[in-house]
Regions:
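Acidic-enriched catalytic cores of C-N bond-cleaving enzymes acting on peptides and small amides
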Residues: 1-4, 28-58, 80, 88-91
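An alpha-helix initiation/capping motif
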Residues: 35-39, 61, 137, 141
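Glycine-rich, small-residue loops and helix-cap segments
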Residues: 44-47, 51-52, 71, 77, ...
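A short helix-breaking turn/cap at a secondary-structure junction
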Residues: 1-37, 41, 98-103
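Residue-level marker of alpha-helix boundaries and capping positions
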Residues: 29-33, 66, 176-179
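Solvent-exposed alpha-helices and their adjacent loops that cap or buttress functional pockets
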Residues: 11-14, 20, 60, 109-111, ...
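Flexible, acidic loop-helix segments that line cofactor/substrate-binding pockets
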Residues: 17-18, 22-25, 55-68, 97, ...
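Flexible loop/turn segments at secondary-structure boundaries
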Residues: 26-30, 61-63, 125-126, 165-168
Length: 188
């Protein structure tokens, strides 16, 4: 069963409040249980006097790839200073400075951090920066514009948080792509 965070709370009159429902959040891939929960929340808002209307974020499909390219590029750049000398974890046993750097990063960073550093380094490398990083920045700006437009007549947007219902902690860690796809509605 889905969580009921507002259960037992006294609700107030929401007359005059407009909430937007981004149409692109309710397409293929959204679990029926999640859809029903969001529609129930919209119904509750309507019942309290809020106006709920559809809005559009046509570039939403670009949000997730743009987010991962930009955040990975930033992580790659920011974590470059974690060398075990001045910043970050320091390996205990090493023969020289190169080994200190290598071991400190091997031991100090988890698999996901290493994955993001590699993706970010690739996205920022010469020959690929225009193809990935700069396009991701353009997509982010387009999404920002669309979100501002959608919020122009709304106090808030109501959308699912993730396509499937929540799974137990540690349940999907073996499939990074599935974990990444779970962020689709939270990155814009």
């Amino acid at each position: 069963a889905l969580a009921r965070p507002c259960a037992g709370r006294k609700m107030q009159d929401l007359s005059g409040l407009t909430v937007g429902l981004p149409a692109e959040c309710f397409g293929e891939g959204l679990d029926a249980q999640v859809r029903a929960a969001v529609e129930a929340a919209a119904g509750t808002l309507r019942g309290l006097g809020a106006q709920v209307r559809k809005v559009s974020l046509p570039s939403l499909p670009y949000a997730l790839p743009a987010y991962y390219v930009i955040s990975s590029a930033e992580a790659s750049s920011n974590l470059a200073r974690y060398d075990g000398v001045r910043y970050g974890y320091r390996a205990q046993a090493y023969a020289d400075l190169d080994e200190l750097y290598r071991k400190s990063r091997q031991e100090g960073f988890g698999m996901e951090v290493k994955r993001r550093i590699m993706l970010g380094t690739f996205a920022l490398s010469s020959g690929y920066q225009d193809q990935y990083y700069l396009k991701a920045l353009k997509a982010r700006e387009l999404l920002r514009h669309e979100a501002a437009e959608a919020l122009g007549g709304c106090a808030a947007l109501l959308s699912p948080v993730a396509p499937p219902p929540a799974y137990r902690l540690g349940e999907k860690t073996g499939d990074p792509m599935e974990m990444y796809l779970g962020d689709i509605y939270t990155v814009p």
